[in-house]
Amino acid sequence: MASRNIWRVRRNFLFDLRGWVPQYSAEVFLKSIPFRPFSVECNSKDGENGDLLNNLLTMGVDVDMARRRQPGVFNKAVTNEQELKMFLLSKGASDKVIGSIISRYPRAITRTPESLSKRWDLWREIMASDLEIVNILERSPESFFRSNNNLNLENNIKFLCSVGLTHKCLCRLLTSAPRTFSNSLNLNKQMVEFLQETGISLGHNNPTDFVRKIISKNPSILIQSTKRVKTNIEFLQSTFNLDKEDLLLLICGPGARILDLSNDCTKRNYTNIKKRLLSLGCTEEEVQKFVLSYLNMIFLSEKKFNDKIDCLLEEKISTSQILENPRVLDSSIHTLKTRIRELAHAGYDVSTSSIALLSWSQRRYEAKLKRLSG
């Protein structure tokens, strides 16, 4: 009878705790060691919470990635991964998305359900649906989980509304530069005040409208330093010899996009553009006019700019054609080569005709190609 009882004890027992179904043998049972509600094997390091690691593995979290990003989370005795999972599932997130969010920003599991709910409600004041927020979290989990200071978030929303930002602009900010709302309120105030002062100094008669224009053109500007933005404004003014009126028009328009670019990157890329075009026989005035006509080219690294110029020159396209059509530099080298080849096959010679269609949208280009091909 005793041996039969022991045999029964040696059978595996199934427990269903918090959704897990691990198995335990008699050796564990007879030693009176408390059962752990996890069965996934993992290699925990000293000081790490083994149960947490097993739990995260079961949830599809890339533990190695999470360790590299925020190792301290795994030493915490109390975490809220199950509560986080249930909360995000209720908002429409999939298991795969939840695993990805925690893998890239493991600190998310330290947020309480109450804090998550409050923060979500504040975001919903701006976004139209839960799914839109889930999409932002999937792309940038840090933007939502980086801070649990919901009062700061609420104050930022109120402040940005008070300076004239529309609901549409706030929505774009949250979508494109969500870290804006995790900034301290003082940081956002400093940037807005700096922009207002800049607008006034350049002769803008409505500083609030100036701020709104800059932010709508460049949502990322609020997460940059005032020093960086100021240096880029000074660079534009000195490089292109602009008076206040022209500078104002530039930074309220296409120039707004480069205000948050690294100062070193701005100068290095422009220096390369200038050097390359001068080597092709352009004058300094032509270089300035070329860059001002399409400032986006300043985002091109030295290699990308030079490779695209080389590609165009190899196809017998002249420097003057490039100067007249700076937007062709927006297209990838693959697109440029493919279109030039297709146009040649259709009897269109880019060396003697307009090259503007090299930068057209795919739909517009295909319609043109169809007409050329008869």
UniProtKB/Swiss-Prot annotation:
Biological process terms in GO annotation: DNA geometric change; DNA-templated transcription termination; regulation of DNA-templated transcription; termination of mitochondrial transcription
Pfam families attached to this UniProt entry: mTERF
Family annotation (SMART domains): Mterf
Subcellular location per the Swiss-Prot or TrEMBL entry: Mitochondrion
Keyword Transcription regulation assigned: yes
A GO MF term: double-stranded DNA binding
Region (Interaction with DNA): 146-147, 224-228, 301-308, 332-335, 361-368
Gene3D superfamilies cross-referenced by the UniProt entry: Transcription termination factor 3, mitochondrial (1.25.70.10)
PTM description: Is a phosphoprotein. While the DNA-binding activity is unaffected by the phosphorylation/dephosphorylation state, only the phosphorylated form of the protein is active for termination activity. Functioning seems to be regulated by phosphorylation.
SS bonds (residue pairs): none
Family: Belongs to the mTERF family.
Role played: Transcription termination factor. Binds to a 28 bp region within the tRNA(Leu(uur)) gene at a position immediately adjacent to and downstream of the 16S rRNA gene; this region comprises a tridecamer sequence critical for directing accurate termination. Binds DNA along the major grove and promotes DNA bending and partial unwinding. Promotes base flipping. Transcription termination activity appears to be polarized with highest specificity for transcripts initiated on the light strand.
UniProt name for this protein: Transcription termination factor 1, mitochondrial
Lineage of the species this protein comes from: Eukaryota, Metazoa, Chordata, Craniata, Vertebrata
